[in-house]
């Protein structure tokens, strides 16, 4: 990808985001909060309207919004100058994230990158919402909390860029927004200037408590070893003598080690998975900044606006990252309750208005989403006695935040705020240990998703709120004690740096995300050819009940799959029988074992049938018999090979012209 093109896209994005934030300052006093509220607000409004009237794939608004933003920037240049530190924090987070995305841009089948990319692709079509499910033909994409993906797609549509670049720029934008909001929270709570950079570093490159001990327990640990320490460390191949001893203390006789990941924000952003926890972190930082503003002198109109936005974060969390709703409610609802007990009633009407308006804007989505089977896979349950975190492992992971919690009890200047936050985070930590979300996983992974989604959010919340409060405290014990909690964890920056330097960067700068599969020039040309053809249901081989390379060719061609990853669709749709039936029938089709392949293709409205290198088994013995059975209605597009013992290409359905 041309650096000129990338630079123009980033410049257009920054100008429009700055203009949007300045426009929002008419109602919201704080610069950082105004930008976040403006972004969320415009996305919510679009999300609502497009359920009735679609904007199209490329709404022609970029010239107008850019000119309007430049005018607002000139008119409010004094405001921009006054808020340069906040702007610098946004650009710091954006640029740091871009160093990872630019070096490692592939959107492959690791983690959930491909399905997250698929949501962006389907929203970029610009049709009436809900859009079609790209991984389950004939069904709408209304079974997942995908507001973050809608926002990324809306950005890409306005900027007239592709889904791959939209994926990466939206990722960097959310990291920049998180950094900006976190910086605002620190600035309000901590007058000690170094505190800002310590908290920012702790969030962007700092690790959890394990990183300090990991180098004594594991030979040459990598970041993955440290974030997957609970469970992984017990069975690690490269344990030191001390590591073997600790492993023995943590192991439970007769129990397989539980896999309890604790991926801090610093690690999460390096993976490149545009997953809903990103939005969860932004909502955390937004709530923290709003609470800090309310506690440090916001009054009148600004206080009412802050209360409105704070309440609105709850319904927004439900459609962005439903996993953190209970904890967002604890944080936000806890502050409202605290204010009420102190005799502050000014928040009541604005908070009700904010919650009602945000919910109303989400209503068209919610009436479908709340009826989907994904909710049947979730139930909060008590953690069984044998499924608790080993005490030693828990302490090795959480000792920094436990220390920060205890040190916050020494805070005297803002004692009410400190006690409220201590209670909130202590309850959150206890809840994450004694309760879990019972989903599709079991055995050693019974708490996997719960700890993966909850711990990282709680850890970041403690560091951001109480860490800032402690570093700004007049108590030297609280201030320097918190430094002792945070500084050792910054050693994670070394491990991240070692990983960044050591990993191959052969696809650097290919921000379409498809470089990994387009290394094969034939596949690259097939994707280019398919992308230019009309929409239609597409099938390709290689699906199993796990993450697979399939259906990457279909996805990067912008086409809809008859079936994507079957395990994921089954999860979203509650074990929908049709998913397993489609998987079995597709495997039969590619094995040339389907009784009537032509009838099956026509019945499922399949327009494109891909034949890829992996289909050329047994000297391509299945190709000619299959071609003979479907050629009456499907035209073969030859891409490579001799169409006998080796073939790469695809069939396209021949649609007969209507009779005159």
What are the residue ranges of the model-derived segments?
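Membrane-embedded, hydrophobic transmembrane alpha-helices
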Residues: 1-81, 359-366, 373-404, 408-411, ...
């Amino acid at each position: 990808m041309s650096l000129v093109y990338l630079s123009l896209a980033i410049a257009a994005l920054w100008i429009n985001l700055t203009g949007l934030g300045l426009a929002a300052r008419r109602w919201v006093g704080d610069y950082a909060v105004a930008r976040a509220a403006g972004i969320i607000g415009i996305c919510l409004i679009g999300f609502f309207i497009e359920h009735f009237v679609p904007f199209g794939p490329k709404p022609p608004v970029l010239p107008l919004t850019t000119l309007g933003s430049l005018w607002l920037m000139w008119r409010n240049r004094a405001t921009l100058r006054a808020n340069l530190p906040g702007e610098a924090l946004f650009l710091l987070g954006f640029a740091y994230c871009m160093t990872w995305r630019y070096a490692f841009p592939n959107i492959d089948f690791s983690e959930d990158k491909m399905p997250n990319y698929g949501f962006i692709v389907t929203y970029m079509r610009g049709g009436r919402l809900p859009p079609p499910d790209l991984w389950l033909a004939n069904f709408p994409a209304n079974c997942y909390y995908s507001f973050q993906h809608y926002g990324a797609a809306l950005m890409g549509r306005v900027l007239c860029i592709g889904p791959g670049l939209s994926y990466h720029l939206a990722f960097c934008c959310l990291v920049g927004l998180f950094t900006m909001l976190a910086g605002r929270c620190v600035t309000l709570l901590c007058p000690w200037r170094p505190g800002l950079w310590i908290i920012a570093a702790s969030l962007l490159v700092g690790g959890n408590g394990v990183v300090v001990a990991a180098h004594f327990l594991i030979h040459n640990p990598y970041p993955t070893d440290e974030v997957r320490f609970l469970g992984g460390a017990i069975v690690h191949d490269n344990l030191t003598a001390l590591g073997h001893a600790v492993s023995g203390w943590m192991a439970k006789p007769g129990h397989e080690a539980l896999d309890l990941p604790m991926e801090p924000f610093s690690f999460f952003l390096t993976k490149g998975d545009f997953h809903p926890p990103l939005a969860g972190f932004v909502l955390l930082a937004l709530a923290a900044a709003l609470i800090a503003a309310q506690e440090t002198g916001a009054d009148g109109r600004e206080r009412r606006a802050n209360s409105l936005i704070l309440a609105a974060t709850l319904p927004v969390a439900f459609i962005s990252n439903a996993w953190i709703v209970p904890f967002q409610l604890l944080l936000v609802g806890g502050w409202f309750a605290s204010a009420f007990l102190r005799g502050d009633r000014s928040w009541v009407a604005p908070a009700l208005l904010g919650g009602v308006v945000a919910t109303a804007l989400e209503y068209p989505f919610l009436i479908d989403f709340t009826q989907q089977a994904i909710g049947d896979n979730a139930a909060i349950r008590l953690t069984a006695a044998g499924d608790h975190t080993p005490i030693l492992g828990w302490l090795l992971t959480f000792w920094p935040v436990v220390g920060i919690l205890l040190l916050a009890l020494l805070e005297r200047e803002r004692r009410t705020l400190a006690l409220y936050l201590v209670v909130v985070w202590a309850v959150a930590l206890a809840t994450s240990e004694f309760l879990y979300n019972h989903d599709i996983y079991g055995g050693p992974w019974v708490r996997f998703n719960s700890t993966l989604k909850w711990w990282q959010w709680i850890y970041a919340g403690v560091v951001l709120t109480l860490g800032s409060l402690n570093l700004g405290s007049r108590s030297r014990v609280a201030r320097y004690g918190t430094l002792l909690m945070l500084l050792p964890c910054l050693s994670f920056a070394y491990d991240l740096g070692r990983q960044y330097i050591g990993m191959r960067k052969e696809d650097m700068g290919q921000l379409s995300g498809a470089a990994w599969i387009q290394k094969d020039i034939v596949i690259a040309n097939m994707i280019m050819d398919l992308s230019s053809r009309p929409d239609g249901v597409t099938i390709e081989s290689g699906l199993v009940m796990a993450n697979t390379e399939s259906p990457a060719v279909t996805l990067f061609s912008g086409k809809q799959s008859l079936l994507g990853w079957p395990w994921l669709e089954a999860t979203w749709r509650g074990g929908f029988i049709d998913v397993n039936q489609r998987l079995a029938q597709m495997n039969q089709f590619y094995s040339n074992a389907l009784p009537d392949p032509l009838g099956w293709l026509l019945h499922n409205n399949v327009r494109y049938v891909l034949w890829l290198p992996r289909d050329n088994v047994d000297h391509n013995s299945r190709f000619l018999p299959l071609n003979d059975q479907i050629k009456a209605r499907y035209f073969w597009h030859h891409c490579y090979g001799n169409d006998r013992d080796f073939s790469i290409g695809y069939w396209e359905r021949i649609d007969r012209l209507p009779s005159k």
